[in-house]
Amino acid sequence: MPVAALIREEIEIPENVNVEVNGSTVAVKSGAKELKRDLLYPGIEISTEDGKVVIECTFPRKAQTAIVGTYRSHIQNMITGVTDGFEYKLVIRYAHFPMKVSAKGNTVTIDNFLGEKYTRTAKIMDGVTVKVSGEEVIVSGANKEFVGQTAANIEQATKVKGRDTRIFQDGIYIVEKAGKVL
């Protein structure tokens, strides 16, 4: 099977976005939002030219081909994050005990989950905002990984253990990920 001598991926840079490549560090900035990420892998070169981010690899192996695609997705997510941002929606569900959810500082506190006396907490990652309004929790931010991890932390904090999950369906569940309804 013939092997490509060069793999080259190009990403268009929107007008209001500034992308800087310094060694292996890629910085994407738009207005007040800025994301930096270290993208280092042997044999892969990242540069900017003519309003595009270029990712190149000469004589790539299978792993390098995969990493080029991964880096393209990371940079595209960084550009989308600083321009539009990412938003996850979670829904609070309870049947037996009404729970109270509030976001303070860098933690989300969940009181009275399944009638428990102690408070459950979930960590909010850096640069992520959490808004609780009624039965809905909205997690938003520029970094897709941090927004997703914060939403997962909240969902995992209300995991039901030691009870029949067919009966006890109380919890906080992700219903929308970055615009995609689940």
From Swiss-Prot:
Molecular function terms, GO-annotated: rRNA binding; structural constituent of ribosome
Keywords, comma-separated and alphabetical: Ribonucleoprotein, Ribosomal protein, RNA-binding, rRNA-binding
GO CC annotation terms, alphabetical: cytosolic large ribosomal subunit
PROSITE patterns in the record: RIBOSOMAL_L6_2
Keyword Lyase listed: no
Subunit: Part of the 50S ribosomal subunit.
Role this protein plays: This protein binds to the 23S rRNA, and is important in its secondary structure. It is located near the subunit interface in the base of the L7/L12 stalk, and near the tRNA binding site of the peptidyltransferase center.
UniProt-recorded name of the protein: Large ribosomal subunit protein uL6
